[in-house]
Amino acid sequence: TIQKNAMSLVLELRKVEQFYLKLSDDERRVFFYKIRSQFNEERRKINYSVYDYSWVIQSSQFIFLNRTCFNGLYRVNSAGEFNVPFGSYKNPKIFDQENIERASELLEDTIIICGDFSTCLDYTDDKTFLYFDPPYRPISGTSSFTSYTKEDFDDDEQIRLANLCREVSEKG
C-alpha cells in the first residue's frame, strides 16, 4: 500500500489517529481490540494479487496495531492471527507522514516478494542487499518462541538459513 497509494494510507491513518487520541484509556483498549479483531478477520478476505482499497484499510490497521500494541511487537498465534495485547501509551504517534512518503518513493521501483527465504537468490544480483531477521533460538527450556508466523522456525530452518547465508557469501 505504501508503494501503490501512500496518500490514501496517510489520510486513513490521520483519521484513525485523531479518533484514537480523543478516547479515554478504557475506550482506547476497546478500540484496539476491535481493530485487532477486524484486522484478523479481513486478512482472510483480501486478494493480494489485485490491488484495491481494502489494502489501504488493512495496512492502516496493521500500522495502528503496531504503534499501539505492547512494545510494538508483531506476533501471531497458530491460526495466523495477530495476537499481541494492547499497550498502554499516553500519546502514541500512530503514523509519520514524511516517513510514509519517503518509503513510497524508495519502493517505487521495488519488487516485493512473499515466500520462502530460499527463493531469494533467484532475484539477486551484485547490487542486492539481503537482510534476514529470523526468530532467535530459545536459550532455555522455558523459552519457546520460535516464530513470527504460524509455522515454526526450528533448528532445521536455522540450518537452511545458515546454508543460504554461506551460499550468498560465496556468491559475493
Mark where each language-model region is:
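Short, glycine/charged-enriched secondary-structure capping and boundary segments
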Residues: 78, 127-128, 144-147
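Amphipathic, non-transmembrane alpha-helical secondary structure
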Residues: 118-122, 159-162
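Conserved proline-anchored active-site loop of SAM-dependent methyltransferases
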Residues: 1, 63, 67-70, 115-117, ...
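SAM-dependent methyltransferase catalytic-core segment centered on the flexible catalytic loop
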Residues: 137-171
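Short, well-structured alpha-helical interface segments that form or flank functional binding sites
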Residues: 58, 112-115, 160
